[in-house]
Amino acid sequence: MSRVRVHNFSISLDGFATGAGQSLEQPFGHAEARLHEWFFQTRTFRSMHGEAGGGAGVDEAVASAWEPGIGAEIMGRNKFGPQRGPWADDEWQGWWGENPPFHTPVFVLTHHPRPSLPMAGGTTFHFLDATPAEALRQAREAAGELDVRIGGGPTTVREFLAADLIDHLHIVVVPIILGRGVRLWDDLEGLEKRFTVESVTTPRGVTHVTFSRP
C-alpha cells in the first residue's frame, strides 16, 4: 500500500506551526516568514518558483524529498486560504497563482465544499467535508500506486497523526520562540513510540527530525 508522508513541516522551539492572527496580508500570522526562511533559501523552493540558485547541504537534501513519488495531496482549508466559514464566492484559487507547485490532485478539507477547481500544470483542488480516513481513501484512489502527502496546516497534520494514518513525518524545528499560534503536538503524548526517530541539526540551528514507521 502507498505511504502517507509529511515533508518540510516547520515548528518553533515551543511547538507552534503557525503564528496567531493569520490573514490575507499575513498568511503565517505574527510568525511572518520566520518558520520557513530555511526553506526559502533552498534550491527546491527557488526552482518551484522558476528561480535559479539556492543553497545545497542538509536543508536542500531534505527539502527535495517532498515531491518524488507523490500522487496526491491532502491539506486543510486554512492552508488553502485565509477565509473562514461559508465561501463568499469561488474567486479565491489559493496562494500559488495559476500554476500551483503540486501537479497532482489536491484534496482540501473543509466544512463548506465547493466545486472542484482545475488549475494549470496538473493540479486540481477538490473540496471535501470528510474524516481523515475518508479523505485518505479518496486521495489514495486518485494517487494510484504513488504516495499521498499531507500538506498541512497543523490542525490537519495533528488529526492524521491522532488517527495513526501517517507513515513518514519530517518536522523542521526552527530556533525561534513564537509564544502563541497553532500548536502541532497537543494531545499526541507518546507519539514517538510508533516510529523510528532520527534527527540532524544544521550549523544555523535548524533541526530536521524524521519519524518513520518501522
Language-model features, listed with the residues they occupy:
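Enzymes that bind and transform nitrogen-containing heteroaromatic metabolites
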Residues: 1-214
